[in-house]
Amino acid sequence: MFGLLVAGQAFCHSAFAQETEIRAATDLPPIPVGMQVEFAGPARTLLTESELGDWDTVDFGGGGESSVASHTLEIGIGEDLTGVFWDGADLPVKDYELRMEARRTEGIDFFCGTVFPVNDSHCCLIVGGWAGATVGLSNIDDKDASSNETTKLLTFQDNRWYDIRIRVLSDRIIVWIDNQCEIYQNIVGRKISLRGDTELCTPMGLCTFQTKAEIRKLTLQRIGKPAKPSKPFEPPIPSSYPSKQ
């Protein structure tokens, strides 16, 4: 049976990092999103109890160790990138949602780089990059997560779990962190691609940069009927939300 998720009544807007003060990811109430989806069946769990299972380590060169215990993926610190890629059954390329909890346990850079399929390409959500604060999609029209309209600066606490949700539709990508809509990106007519060695994480992968992290409650759920936006997509505008120190 289809499950119905109601996500609010208005769109969320991303903002350029240079126009947005650093703030805590959970300082503000959730921004309503104004769309509904019907899920095509239950969510699929992507982590086993004690082994990598359908995941395999990425040979980045100089990477740390990755392992699974108690349904939690631990990604160790490497010289640069460390991560795993999906080596299991075929994945959807649109109309699906990835969800997980992630935390940084050591290091100062991104603790959740999630590579995922988008139509005929792939994209990567960066959480906590560029010295620990940048959130964004890499790449949009060849611009990475630090320099496109999805770029935001948020503060993240070490050893704190953050709920991360990525919804991929044929025409847009939506990202929530702790139920706060942080990215609403129109991808029609845009070039979606990956930056550098994250291409080794396809078709789906999880990675960190010089950072130790843990991922748990990782699921994938297909979407049966994505709702259309209640109004035409509007370009991102600078955030007017106050920062909280």
What do these predicted regions represent?
Residues 21-59, 229-245:
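Extracellular carbohydrate-recognition regions
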Residues 64-82:
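Short carbohydrate-recognition loop motifs
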Residues 79-139:
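Secretory/extracellular carbohydrate-interaction modules
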Residues 84-90, 150-156, 204-205:
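Beta-strand-rich interaction surfaces with strong enrichment in secreted/lumenal proteins
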Residues 100, 218-220:
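Extracellular beta-strand elements of beta-rich domains used
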Residues 141-163:
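Short, aromatic/His-centered strand-loop micro-motif at the edge of beta-sheets
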Residues 163-189, 218:
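Carbohydrate-binding surfaces in secreted/extracellular proteins
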Residues 185-214, 237-238:
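Flexible glycan-contacting loops in extracellular carbohydrate-active proteins
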